[in-house]
């Protein structure tokens, strides 16, 4: 992994104010190997921030840039490099777990060979029920399937909203390993979670949001 501080920013936000307003402008420069952990109570704006960084919401003020270019100038091009995981696992109940994984990766422009799909299903504990309708998956199983999709996408930037929701201890450990490998390979991530900052290995920054729309930055490597 290259030196994060010396590398140019992959994702940058300048003077960012969300649709609700009321928060001081946020500046962010996320470089290869860096992770920003966004914390805050329900309603503090974590999901809105991630959706704004993903290009799903337009900010009230400011801009989000990928490799120096405004993401809204070429959203399809941005999506070739970014994987977003929201609260919804994005699974079709009519498809099996295996079909969901195969189809989602194809749509994301990141198709994978069958052996890779099988290995991911096995590693995430989904192999036994891989050919059953996804409607039968528990919330935790659905989350693991969504994480397998993010991992196999190999996108440079991951935007993850509560990725640990519904995970057991073993799956949480696998998520940590997945993040470590992503960062070590030069990837970057913004992750929203209620868990303490120390829970995420490789976390270089913590952004604290509160219900009054205040933002407090802990550390100064990639947030200002």
From Swiss-Prot:
Chief site of localization: membrane
Name of the protein described by the UniProt record: Cytochrome c biogenesis ATP-binding export protein CcmA
The EC number(s) this enzyme carries: 7.6.2.5
Family matches, as SUPFAM superfamilies: P-loop containing nucleoside triphosphate hydrolases
Cellular component, GO, one term: plasma membrane
Organism of derivation: Bordetella parapertussis (strain 12822 / ATCC BAA-587 / NCTC 13253)
Binding site for ATP: 40-47
Quaternary structure note: The complex is composed of two ATP-binding proteins (CcmA) and two transmembrane proteins (CcmB).
One record GO biological process: cytochrome complex assembly
Annotated keywords: ATP-binding, Cell inner membrane, Cell membrane, Cytochrome c-type biogenesis, Membrane, Nucleotide-binding, Translocase, Transport
UniProt superkingdom: Bacteria
The UniProt record lists the keyword DNA repair: no
Entry's family note: Belongs to the ABC transporter superfamily. CcmA exporter (TC 3.A.1.107) family.
Localisation per UniProt entry: Cell inner membrane
Pfam family, one: ABC_tran
Role, per record: Part of the ABC transporter complex CcmAB involved in the biogenesis of c-type cytochromes; once thought to export heme, this seems not to be the case, but its exact role is uncertain. Responsible for energy coupling to the transport system.
Membrane topology term: Peripheral membrane protein
